[in-house]
């Protein structure tokens, strides 16, 4: 910041006043307001433009790609200026918010015609990434959360607010869970005490450009928090919310509330309470697991293909946002899960005969009631918001008709009907509310209130009169002219209007003797006189001001309408929640029918049994998908706790593991699952250690990241956790990696006792099954022909025979000479391993294999002789009498696929 900039924003009154004296009155006004918001861009209203000055102008010009100009001077330097049109401000604001900027809106509130000096201006609202409510600034299908954090000793207090939905939540956890909570909540903006410095926050600010604001520490005072929050909720205390023991998170909530009030410049009356989240409410997932499962974002940061992109066919934006929330917050309460599953079952009906499609069709015409309700509370709802709300409320009874009979016992059971019926009952619109909206609004109101045409005819007598004057001006003049001709007997009398003289009656000089006494001369012309009468004068005053007065009257009536609608905030929020939930349940039903999903079953036994499971996302990306079983937990002969998974690269190990986790996640969300059947015991957490990545900003290598993730799992996994471990130890030397992988596997078996899928290329780990009864080996099959590999993607019992790494390298396009050299080195290593001889120096120039690398062009490597056809190789391994019908069919598909690739 330049010295002149520091002086303009100085907190020293003497310095600041000295700076002001060098500026015009208007610029003094600007600087006084700007000094209150030094760290934000300020849109300063001047006529039809929002202007920015000094450093704000330079910054905005770069960010928005707008012209940087000058206006006057300051301390001998030109004042930089940039501006955007008032009517197009939203598109510029949206861009700034996406870049993480906050913007102060300073409006003209005085009348330029009556102002002496600069027009009075004041800040009407502050737009920040976490406090958005305008439809033009928000993503339709994504929530925008404001998060406040406070730390006391090892306790992390969180409070977050979705202002556009009126949802306010708090929770407390260990400070070690900061990264996991940031990944779960995905806040648009974070508030911290000035004294708090969190490493996890700093890392993410650098990596993801998070918007972080530091507030005075006193705003997080826990002693004052209860009073502040109780005053907002209109309660004596907070005992009704179950948060008496959450002092740290309440301090964060109080600071968040104050910040939100400041930004809105209006009451936030739709924030009527808070919800307490406990750590055991949801199936927990750390940040790594959420990323690896690609729930709503791919590893590369794309929105598709993900689990959310596959499932989100919701009819409403409210439903889409709730679906995303459900996928990131799988429930642990079996009763709540069963309620959702019952609802889905009912909406599907027998053989797809349920009402889900008709419900979805009705909901497609329902607007975003949730966000409109917030804008009503904040007095920022626009006319089309209200007309959309009116039309949506009128359509909701059709949903009831679509699910007629849900209040009685259906084929799915009485509980099914009761759950859906409860949602239908909760979304029934208040008749008085609908009547008010119908009576007050035009059928198709104008987009903006400033243009008028919003309030319905017949709603207000004064407005009707003003409109009649404005709209029927010509008709009145013709009627007056006819009456005056009859009264005076002057046939050529005219009643007319012009901008300079207003309304007048024109009479030629030949008829001046017939002029009545109530005519008053307004203008003399060469051949005529122009007059005005008391009646015409009164009409003129009304007509000339009718349009502006009508607009002011509409604004007044619209404000009163918003006040009346505020009485229905609780009702509208309940309607919105019910519509969103019914939408998600109907979407689950539609997806289950379209994608052939089945109803998951839950048990109190420690077991995960899935028959013919599929990866929900991958199966839609390929022509055919091989379904596979998984069995973990209690079984005859003991508890099958760990599967050691071997097989070739690209053989499907990671897909197999992920599909197990995704099936478990979907079941806990209340969705049907991509499997023939699924039986799931109690789960508390999902963990994944999959893939390779580094953290350059944090100074952590790929192997360090891998070990950090493994350490987190070993410290936190329980006997009710599902753990996916993929190729642990590959980031270091062979022996180090193998030793670590073996030790980690044993720790998971003996200490954590978690359900574990352990994929590896260390075939030595398959010996765990010999040492531990709770370990089983499975592998994904592949066959080779002429050094080409065919992946069968079928999971079979027992360990794999080899990894097929060279064949996969060839598929990746590694040059043939490299593959041939690698094959010879591999042969030597295998021979040495079999002969139990010390490993030779593969890279010595005296080595036989180094010399063979220089074979004459066109010569044939004897090791390249072709083995038998892969289909024949596979057929030789099949024992028909040992195959079930299902396994035989899978083998047949594998043979066909192998044959087609030849």
Swiss-Prot record:
InterPro entries for the chain: DNA_mismatch_repair_MutS, DNA_mismatch_repair_MutS-lik_N, DNA_mismatch_repair_MutS/MSH, DNA_mismatch_repair_MutS_C, DNA_mismatch_repair_MutS_clamp, DNA_mismatch_repair_MutS_core, DNA_mismatch_repair_MutS_N, DNA_mismatch_repair_MutS_sf
**Positions of ATP binding:** 647-654
Which keywords describe this protein according to UniProt? ATP-binding, DNA damage, DNA repair, DNA-binding, Nucleotide-binding
- Could you provide one GO biological process annotation from this protein's UniProt record? mismatch repair
SMART domains, A to Z: MUTSac (SM00534), MUTSd (SM00533)
One Gene Ontology CC term in the entry? cytosol
Record keywords: Calcium included? no
One GO MF annotation is: mismatched DNA binding
What NCBIfam families does UniProt report for this protein, alphabetically? mutS1, PRK05399.1
UniProt record similarity statement: Belongs to the DNA mismatch repair MutS family.
UniProt protein name:
DNA mismatch repair protein MutS
Q: Could you tell me the gene encoding this protein?
A: mutS
